[in-house]
Amino acid sequence: IAAAIQGWEMRLLRGVAESALDGLFGLDRDGFAECESVDALFWIGPALTQEPSLSPRLCEGLAALPLAGAPNRLSREYRDWPELQRIHGLCRAPRLPARRWRVAPGEPSNDNPGLPLRPLLHRRRSAQRMDGRAGIDVGLLRAWLRRLLPERSPVPFAVTGEAARVDLLLFVHRVRGLVPGLYWLDRSGLRRPPMREDFLWQHVDPELPLYLLQEGDARALSAYLSCQQDIAGDGCVALAMLAHLGAALEEGPWCYPRLYWECGQVGQLLYLEAEAAGLSGTGIGCYYDPLVHELLGLTDESMASLYHFTLGRAVWDTRLCNMPAYPAMRRD
């Protein structure tokens, strides 16, 4: 998003194996108190139609550069997690074929005409509490959900060049013009696994793949599923991000962490959309994923709940002091 403001594009470079990236940036050398690794390599610059290739000579030259400075110690105490190290090794992407980078431009939107993006990026904060009273109009929710469709928002969803694999289970609490209950946003277009037979699957919007599953007050349910956190029930709407895990793993185990990347992209857009509307959002990392799967009637591991989120009017703690996120640079 920050690159797009400058007129640049950001794209994932797939032509170098992740394990080789550590050597390119010197993370495989002595002197590191903790094991560090490179997760991804990106191109940031003018728009290109095709992923550029990195020549072996360039890679060898980068790997031979001297390491400047000394690595910082990340923690006073280091705890070894061998199982996490094993999973990390299994999930590193190999060298992958290049892909075309040209994508269709996003559809223009007048949801927030004249609203500058830079201040939203600077002041974006996670809410700690929601007031439990504020509501939104259904038109605003539709605008938010339209923004989450990959074809509507190539920034940021075109960064990896991979198809969407994350759908959304919505807990609608206070949305004027939309009955409270459970909804499903089919943003990936992938085939759904069997779910509960009593779900309605009622299409509720001509412009969105949005379906009503079940009517009812879902505030207590959403709070309980998010580890009994009231913030999930006190917002206007909460959601669970469910990934098509089976389809991703068929392509390779390296797709697993990228499902979290996609959830992060969804969350970032929701943060900014909430700020633009004078509201706030917050990610919820503690939740009972087996109970979410049980709620939907999922009987296998083809889908998995990977992250939760909520949006509403924040209640700020007046004991906290706000400091500018990006203080002006000074020249002495």
Region roles according to the model:
Residues I1-D332:
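Acidic, surface-exposed loops and disordered segments
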